[in-house]
Amino acid sequence: MRYSFCMLEKTNIPLIRALNLTLVSLCFAMLPNPVHADSLPERIDLFVSLFDYNSATTSYDIRSIQTDFPTRLLTPDSMLPQTSEYPLKDIQLLYKLAQSCTGKLPLSPLITEPLVFTRSLCKGSSLSPRWFARSGLIHPGGGTYAFRYAEKYPAQFANLLPYMHIQERPNAAEGTLLYHLQNMGEDAINALVSGASMFGSGSDLWLRKGDIYYLFNEETWLTNANKAGLSYSLLSADNTCFIQRGNICWDVEDHSDLLRTSMIILVIANIFLVLGWSGYRWNSKRQEMRSRMLILQILTHELRTPIASLSLTVEGFRREFEHLPESLYDEFRRLCEDSRRLRQLAEASKDYLQSDSKPLASDWVPSVEEWLQYKVEEEFSGNVTLKLNQDIAAKLNVYWLGTCVDNLLRNAVKYGVAPVTLEVITQTNLVTFKVTDQGSLTHRDWRHLRKPFVSKSGLGLGLTIVESMVGRMGGKMSLEGPPTTFILEIPCETDTASR
């Protein structure tokens, strides 16, 4: 399951792919070395075998420890009242006797030794070191007989030291056995008393080989644990211990935190790289669009020369109009109209290309009603009904707005359901155009229809252009229905006083 942390999503971006490969290599490098033993006990055995006992900081013979420091002089429980070994009532009587040296004597045979000790203190009679050696060492009230006796007879303190608990003795010099014992925790003391194969105390590892305990410093301990692929913690109530040796809980070395950190770094790096790559692509596209716009500007500028020449030619024909045969009148009219439209298109394109993201230029239309009425009658031959709430003068971009309205009307006539209506609502600083047919499109279809090259009735590209132009004029376009209604809202200057 560890290898799943290093499974990364494929990408076609070379820089991100290179980073992914680098971090994958790092992930696998952090995984446990395959030469490690498979099972946890085998790894612990490997850990033990890595120690050089000649490099131990010191060593102690367990038999000497047992001789010099009996178990009762080591365990912390010995410093507490021994209520589990003596009748509580007799301990209470013994306590009263020790306080006043008078009173009823306890009768339990278990209390004989403490009674002898207490009466000796009351009478002032001496006790030889041999008595302490033969005794149970620990007083029923906790602590040793020797320490209690030395409190009353300080001159005997040095002679009675071997019979005192390690916590009752003066602090030993650093590096001595007593120093190590006095600084051990309860779990370490219990591990030592039980003869555990290893246990930890402070920064030292006590490692048993035969009857000898060898002490190794923390650096050696950690180095060998890493080599064996192990992690450890000292025994506590909060830990779940899979395999315990002394007071040490062993587990396979866990790289999950490091791997998790690496994956977070990878995700963040990928995000920044994707953002950088997206910014680079956006700038590249923007530069490409600018180059194309420049070319279009040049072409538009160059088109003005032949259009101007064509206009002069048409003007020459106009001056000789009376000499033209009647059979050419219709062709000449179309030539004049096409020449005018070409000139408008060139000017509108120049305006569009030069304005960049600015609103398109606009001119005053003296009568919105007359402008639209001419468009409806001339170009749609009565297939479209015009409705206008109030005629006004408005400042509009006639060419592009006319193109947008034409596009919507042609779509409605060609793909919609008759009758088709163009409704114009004029307000102060706003003109709204509504192109309605009896189709069934609703506002839910707008997101799909506005995509370029959508094949639904061939509307996609035209609507995309219309929406773009409306946006350039500072307006907005929307769809409502049924019936199908395309709405153009164009902010503009208006003037009702001139009407």
Curated annotation (Swiss-Prot):
**Spans within the Periplasmic topological domain:** 32-257
Give all cystine bridges in this chain. Answer: C101-C122, C241-C249
Traits of the deletion mutant: Mutants lacking this gene display a significant colonization defect in an infant mouse intestine colonization assay. Mutants show a decrease in vpsL expression and are deficient in biofilm formation. Deletion of the gene results in a 4.4-fold reduction in vxrA expression and a 134.8-fold reduction in survival following penicillin G treatment compared to those of the wild type.
Provide the primary localization. Answer: membrane
Report the residues modified as Phosphohistidine.
Answer: H301
Indicate where this protein resides in the cell. Answer: Cell inner membrane
Supply the name of the protein: Sensor histidine kinase VxrA
Source species of the chain:
Vibrio cholerae serotype O1 (strain ATCC 39315 / El Tor Inaba N16961)
